[in-house]
UniProtKB/Swiss-Prot annotation:
Key words, A-Z: Cell membrane, Lipid biosynthesis, Lipid metabolism, Membrane, Nucleotidyltransferase, Phospholipid biosynthesis, Phospholipid metabolism, Transferase, Transmembrane, Transmembrane helix
Gene assigned in the entry: cdsA
Protein name: Phosphatidate cytidylyltransferase
Lipid metabolism is among the record's keywords: yes
Organism for this UniProt entry: Staphylococcus aureus (strain COL)
Pathway recorded for this protein: Phospholipid metabolism; CDP-diacylglycerol biosynthesis; CDP-diacylglycerol from sn-glycerol 3-phosphate: step 3/3
Amino acid sequence: MKVRTLTAIIALIVFLPILLKGGLVLMIFANILALIALKELLNMNMIKFVSVPGLISAVGLIIIMLPQHAGPWVQVIQLKSLIAMSFIVLSYTVLSKNRFSFMDAAFCLMSVAYVGIGFMFFYETRSEGLHYILYAFLIVWLTDTGAYLFGKMMGKHKLWPVISPNKTIEGFIGGLFCSLIVPLAMLYFVDFNMNVWILLGVTLILSLFGQLGDLVESGFKRHFGVKDSGRILPGHGGILDRFDSFMFVLPLLNILLIQS
């Protein structure tokens, strides 16, 4: 517990100023986190980060995470790069004489999209305003807290025991309920320019998909037989273990709230 608490304090001291600063500093930080998360995901499938498919995936990830506001050329480069990456990793299945399989190639492409889109929207959301990223973080944290407390006090029915044995239906519902505190509290300080009932609905959707994001990452770990995605955060696991919910929450927040 001491190690876990110390790690959380150090992470907060490093993370909070970068989040408040935003801009280029946050973009670089998000890219570093994304590369670590990609390495964790590839390692689950026994794909070395320093290898042909690993390095191609890393390049694809960096391109996916180019800032969208830089201009229309960004999306053109992203599309062409993903096409090129697909051809390269598929060709490598032949060049490696099937030591690198078609399933591995598909996994690399999926990993780049999964990690890249999630972390790209990390700094894109912050660029729209500090209140949006705080809104996302508070939803995830209160959902997790509510799910834990309700599950501890009332949990009797397992949610998905094959993937995550400790999660319960009661905890899942409790997490949704607790997430509603966020918009009700933030509306006193921030004008979201949205009807309160619509904002509550968006919050429930984000809370729901945040919990699904957690289950997806748990599914990865269960499938590949690992306890944590990594060991970079003592007591907490890896980067993916800490940001799994945000892989779903941040893109959806942009679609439902910012770009609507």
